[in-house]
Amino acid sequence: MALRSVKTPTLITSVAVVSSSVTNKPHSIRFSLKPTSALVVHNHQLSFYGSNLKLKPTKFRCSASALTPQLKDTLEKLVNSEKVVLFMKGTRDFPMCGFSNTVVQILKNLNVPFEDVNILENEMLRQGLKEYSNWPTFPQLYIGGEFFGGCDITLEAFKTGELQEEVEKAMCS
């Protein structure tokens, strides 16, 4: 599988994913190609070369909801297992994302004990958590069993002192 920008001519074989960021909204198209065929992407136009090329979009499996009842129960147990829980990319010792690292540093600065959950280890957890919190991005911070926010909200609350107040309330309850 190859992922290339459509800004320059690209040769892709087997399975191709073509992304375009022309409108600042990435669009992806996935095609199955015969191994002897090729897909050339140039100036936002697709040209196909190969003998007897049959192009068809691949089928995507989309469930109605990634948040199964079992996963919802697991998430409820996780967010209530500690006073502060951070769902993040990576771990507190090795964050795999700048936003996750920012929230970890804020919590460490406040000397807040927290549980970290690496969402990169489980795709079902990652997708289900987006539905559970109704929040599309990570990290996701939970305080006292309630969703608090992502990186931007946490950073702003840290600057205003609101984060420390919420953490103190949760620790005392």
Curated annotation (Swiss-Prot):
Disruption phenotype: Plants display high sensitivity to external oxidants, and their content of protein carbonylation is higher than wild-type plants.
Domains: entry comment: The C-terminal region (79-168) is involved in BOLA recognition in GRXS-BOLA apo-heterodimer.
Subunit structure, interactors included: [2Fe-2S]-bridged holo-homodimer. Interacts with N-terminal part of CAX1 in yeast. Interacts in vitro with SUFE1, BOLA1, BOLA2 and BOLA4. Interacts in vivo only with SUFE1, BOLA1 and BOLA4. Interacts with SBP1.
Gene: GRXS14
Something else known: The GRXS14-BOLA1 apo-heterodimer model derived from NMR data shows a domain arrangement totally different from the holo-heterodimer showing evidence for a Rieske-type ligation of a [2Fe-2S] cluster.
Gene3D superfamilies xrefs: Glutaredoxin
Pfam family of the protein (one): Glutaredoxin
Region (Required for CAX1 activation): 97-100, 133-137
Broad class of where this protein is predominantly found: plastid
Function: May only reduce GSH-thiol disulfides, but not protein disulfides (Potential). Probably involved in the regulation of the redox state of the BOLA proteins (Potential). May act as Fe-S cluster donors to Fe-S cluster-requiring proteins. May protect cells against protein oxidative damage. May regulate CAX cation transporters. The GRXS14-BOLA1 heterodimer binds a labile, oxygen sensitive Fe-S cluster.
InterPro entries: Glutaredoxin, GRX_PICOT-like, Monothiol_GRX-rel, Thioredoxin-like_sf
GO molecular function per UniProt: 2 iron, 2 sulfur cluster binding; antiporter activity; metal ion binding
Alphabetical UniProt keywords: 2Fe-2S, Chloroplast, Disulfide bond, Glutathionylation, Iron, Iron-sulfur, Metal-binding, Plastid, Redox-active center, Transit peptide
One CC-aspect GO term: chloroplast stroma
Entry protein name: Monothiol glutaredoxin-S14, chloroplastic
Sequence positions that bind glutathione: K89, R126, K130, F138, C151, D152
Domain of life: Eukaryota
Compartment annotation: Plastid, Chloroplast
Originating organism: Arabidopsis thaliana
Transit peptide per record: 1-63
